[in-house]
Amino acid sequence: MANTAQARKRVLQNEKRRLHNASLRSRLRTYVKGVLKAVHVGDQEQARSALRAAESVIDKTVGKGVAHRNMAARTKSRLSARVKAMGNAAQ
């Protein structure tokens, strides 16, 4: 238990940050799932627009220090590969 005023304040700040970061991580996962869902359905145009939105959210999450940049690069690469494979399969 925090004994000093400073320690109590830090506990409150950390909890506030934890909740905010959890919200950002959840948003990130939601956008990634949106791309995967569009790919699964086979809607190429929807997948492309979802990919653009997801990449933006991924980059913002990295900029805020919530996600690691390597995870972001890996995720964007895998998502774009799936969307690109959709285009090749359609031709």
From Swiss-Prot:
Database matches in SUPFAM superfamilies: Ribosomal protein S20
InterPro entries from the UniProt entry: Ribosomal_bS20, Ribosomal_bS20_sf
Single GO molecular function: structural constituent of ribosome
GO biological process: translation
Keywords assigned: Ribonucleoprotein, Ribosomal protein, RNA-binding, rRNA-binding
Superkingdom per UniProt: Bacteria
Family annotation (Pfam families): Ribosomal_S20p
Gene Ontology CC entries for this record: cytosol; small ribosomal subunit
Family listed: Belongs to the bacterial ribosomal protein bS20 family.
Job of this protein: Binds directly to 16S ribosomal RNA.
PANTHER family per record: 30S RIBOSOMAL PROTEIN S20, SMALL RIBOSOMAL SUBUNIT PROTEIN BS20C
Protein name as annotated: Small ribosomal subunit protein bS20
Organism, scientific name: Acidithiobacillus ferrooxidans (strain ATCC 23270 / DSM 14882 / CIP 104768 / NCIMB 8455)
